[in-house]
Regions:
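N-terminal helix-turn-helix
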Residues: 2-89, 250-258, 278-281, 288
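Short, solvent-exposed recognition segments
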Residues: 2-3, 131-205, 271
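Short, structured helix-loop boundary elements
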Residues: 13-17, 70, 74, 88, ...
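Amphipathic alpha-helical regulatory segments at dimerization interfaces
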Residues: 26, 41, 93-105, 194, ...
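Amphipathic alpha-helical effector-binding/dimerization core
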Residues: 67, 72-168
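Short, solvent-exposed cationic patches
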Residues: 144-150, 239-259
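Extended hydrophobic
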Residues: 176-251, 268
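Short, highly charged C-terminal tails/helix-capping segments
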Residues: 258-285
């Protein structure tokens, strides 16, 4: 069978793009580097690395010292990073009142999470008022397949396997972690149907999390709002909490320009109050 020249050129272009991205990531890890060091780091022939670096230099993503010949990241990368930081900063500011309102209703720590390279990363947090509370470390990444916030992203991804960047079975972090595509596909369908993601002790034994996706102008989530708590405590207030998260996620999405979501009739605040009061009474003796 003859090879389609258009498809062949397309495959070659994708390969070149991936190699160029590998070089950028290598420069980010290594800092100023010689051609040979970079080629070895990413497994390329020096001539191929030199050609790709030349293109990146021409676009300002990489610069080369004229005397030493060493390469470093260019100002175009910094400009992109500043744009990303600006977007993230705006998102945090707009989301903050919602995080505070949810925290005030349930007493638990509330997280604003984004997806970075297949990992759920907390970028903002309203710390809970409970003596025993579950906090996501700011800036730390968690495997998206094992946490509620990560699943809230994956459920809407066209190619969620590519987002994870790994082959199944995925890492089993606890006995309850879902590690096969079949298990995750079923869960993602349920998340899309309900608008919320519930993860029970899949990332850490004894901890359960609930999350709701936040959208901007498309059906691809730009963030997720999540609450994590000791399993017994969270399950006792799950009904009201999921509805409360969903209501705030819908409102935040509208503020970010989304218009396709509908808000539930009851945002969950009343249900959550009775659930939370019951959970507080049952856990008071345990010193929670």
């Amino acid at each position: 069978m003859a090879v389609d020249p258009v498809q062949e050129r397309s495959a070659s272009s994708v390969q070149s793009l991936l190699r160029a991205l590998d070089l950028l990531e290598a420069l980010g890890r290594l800092g100023d580097s010689r051609l040979g060091e970079l080629a070895d780091e990413v497994g390329l022939h020096p001539s191929t690395a030199h050609r790709l670096l030349g293109t990146l230099c021409a676009r300002g993503f990489v610069t080369q010292d004229g005397r030493s010949g060493r390469y470093r990241l260019g100002y175009a990368v910094l400009a992109l990073a500043q744009d990303t930081g600006k977007h993230t900063g705006e998102l945090r500011v707009i989301a903050r009142p919602h995080l505070d309102a949810i925290r005030d209703a349930c007493g638990e720590t509330v997280n604003l999470v984004v997806l970075e390279r297949g990992r759920a990363v907390c970028i903002e947090q309203a710390e809970g008022t409970r003596r025993v509370r579950m906090n996501m470390e700011l800036g730390r990444g968690f495997s998206a397949h094992s946490v509620a916030s990560g699943k809230a992203f994956l459920a809407y991804a066209k190619e969620w396997r590519a987002v994870l960047g790994r082959d199944e079975p995925y890492d089993r972090l606890t006995p309850r972690t879902k590690v096969t595509g079949e298990e995750l596909e079923a869960e993602f369908a349920a998340i899309r149907a309900s608008g919320v993601s519930v993860e029970q002790e899949e990332n850490e034994v004894g901890v359960t999390c609930v999350a709701a996706p936040v959208f901007s102008t498309s059906m691809t989530p730009v963030a997720a709002i999540s609450v994590c708590a000791p399993t017994t405590r969270l399950l006792e207030m799950q009904s009201g909490l999921t509805r409360l998260l969903r209501g705030h996620a819908v409102e935040l999405s509208r503020q970010l320009g989304h218009s396709l979501l509908t808000s539930p009739e009851d945002n969950g605040a009343r249900t959550l109050k009775s659930d939370f009061d019951r959970a507080s009474e049952s856990s008071r003796g345990a010193g929670s």
